[in-house]
């Protein structure tokens, strides 16, 4: 790993620990999906930043593109993945390459896939055959941004990077790739990972606001496949072998310690060069899949993993599972970390999110952010509920619920989230 990345990661940890308050999670329409709750040996793999029309590096696959090598390997093991594709980085200039082995290896101001001055070999815009192959073989394709420009500032590691100027620019960029996939392939991309997983944006917006608008879920991962990290070995072959080991051994050790370790997990992979312009994933993916197969795992796209359970803390053994799943499809009941926290008391803000129409909630929050540059997570829903007499004018979003509107709920004297969701009249959906 380059020293810049090491320093950036350590600095971020220190800031989070000493300065940044603990992250708060709120009920919303978009949640960050890193894993799901299941006892079955089923998991998912995501492949960021492709498709890549250049060969693997080093090329020991007769000139086949890296993406073809990955698809061949997945097919060999009966596995299918989620490919987080970009559109085209050809407009990301003027720019220059940074130091090899650093986070800026492919561009100081922008990302370039698969490499700087090779943009015409990357992305969905230039790789029609690869996109069609992904779809024909049952893989999922998700929206990783048309130009793969980060949504906001990221001072650690990417301090010199250009970022999108705000909410509208992010929506425009995602819509461009969304439309390309719809018009060219008749394919709709519901989940999405933001470029470099940057969430905070200018004007008080976040990636969650953008995905609310797009109707996406935020797709992330719980286990790093590690193919993007460069080895510090000076000899190229020794470096490649070290990178392959760094991808395979953590998975092997995790499975030896706990054979159920990967149940419901999402494993992050790279469909492109690492920071040293090598592609260890081309060599290590087969070893990883062989390990998972040895332990009886099925590897599926994230969309199919979500069919197992859409939640991180609730599975099919929960008596309310079907009700909760139906509610989550039309109402905001899940926290941003994809947890339900069923046995905690419900707050007034969470009740407002359950009752208010999605369009009203999102529109009001966006309008408030445009107007004054700040808005609470529940402000849009609270405003609608107050106007419709469902919560009192004096109620604060953090107050615990002590009564429920009779037209919306069957009688209950308990106000945990579990009991409130159980009492909700489903004919109000």
Each model region followed by its residue ranges:
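Active-site beta->alpha N-cap acidic-glycine motif
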Residues: 3, 8-143, 147-153, 157-158, ...
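Second-shell loop/turn segments in exported
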Residues: 50-61, 154-168, 274-278, 311-314, ...
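Feature responds to low-complexity, polar/acidic, surface-exposed segments characteristic
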Residues: 306-321, 329-417, 426-429
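Short secondary-structure transition/capping segments
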Residues: 94-97, 154-157, 230-238, 311, ...
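Short acidic/His/Gly/Ser-rich catalytic and metal-binding motifs that mark active-site loops
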Residues: 92-94, 149-155, 227-230, 360-363, ...
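Catalytic domains of cell-wall/extracellular-matrix polysaccharide-remodeling enzymes
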Residues: 119, 123-127, 133, 146-268, ...
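Sec-exported extracytoplasmic/periplasmic mature domains
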Residues: 75-79, 135-136, 175, 179-186, ...
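Extracytoplasmic/secreted proteins, especially bacterial periplasmic and envelope-associated proteins
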Residues: 42, 65-69, 126-129, 165, ...
């Amino acid at each position: 790993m380059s020293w810049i990345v090491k320093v950036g990661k350590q600095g971020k940890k220190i800031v989070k620990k000493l300065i940044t308050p603990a992250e708060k999670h709120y009920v919303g329409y978009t949640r960050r999906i890193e894993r799901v709750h299941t006892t079955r040996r089923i998991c998912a793999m995501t492949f960021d930043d492709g498709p890549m029309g250049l060969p693997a590096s080093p090329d020991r696959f007769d000139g086949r593109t890296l993406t073809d090598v990955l698809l061949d390997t997945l097919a060999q093991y009966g596995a299918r993945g989620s490919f987080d594709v970009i559109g085209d980085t050809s407009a990301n200039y003027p720019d220059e390459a940074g130091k090899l082995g650093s986070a800026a290896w492919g561009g100081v101001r922008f990302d370039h896939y698969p490499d700087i001055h090779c943009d015409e070999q990357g992305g969905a815009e230039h790789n029609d055959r690869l996109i069609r192959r992904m779809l024909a073989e049952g893989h999922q394709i998700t929206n990783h941004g048309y130009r793969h420009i980060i949504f906001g500032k990221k001072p650690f590691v990417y301090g010199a990077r250009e970022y999108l100027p705000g909410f509208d620019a992010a929506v425009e960029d995602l819509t461009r790739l969304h439309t390309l996939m719809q018009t060219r392939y008749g394919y709709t991309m519901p989940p999405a990972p933001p470029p470099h997983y940057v969430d905070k944006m200018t004007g008080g917006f976040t990636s969650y606001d953008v995905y609310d608008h797009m109707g996406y879920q935020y797709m992330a991962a719980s286990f790093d496949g590690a193919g993007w990290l460069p080895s510090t070995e000076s000899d190229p072959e020794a470096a490649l072998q070290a990178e392959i080991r760094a991808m395979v051994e953590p998975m092997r050790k995790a499975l030896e310690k706990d054979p159920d370790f990967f149940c419901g997990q999402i494993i992050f992979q790279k469909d492109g060069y690492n920071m040293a312009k090598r592609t260890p994933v081309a060599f290590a993916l087969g070893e990883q899949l062989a390990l998972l197969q040895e332990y009886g795992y099925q590897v599926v796209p994230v969309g199919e993993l979500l069919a197992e359970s859409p939640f991180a803390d609730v599975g099919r053994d929960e008596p309310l599972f079907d009700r909760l799943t139906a509610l989550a499809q039309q109402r905001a009941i899940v926290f941003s970390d994809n947890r339900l926290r069923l046995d905690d008391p419900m707050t007034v803000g969470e009740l407002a999110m359950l009752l208010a129409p999605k369009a009203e909630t999102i529109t009001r929050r966006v309008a408030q952010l445009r107007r004054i540059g700040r808005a609470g997570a529940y402000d849009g829903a609270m405003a609608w509920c107050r106007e419709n007499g469902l919560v009192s004018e004096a109620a604060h979003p953090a107050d615990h619920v002590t009564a429920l509107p009779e037209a919306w709920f069957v009688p209950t004297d308990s106000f945990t989230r579990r009991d409130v969701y159980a009492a909700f009249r489903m004919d109000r959906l």
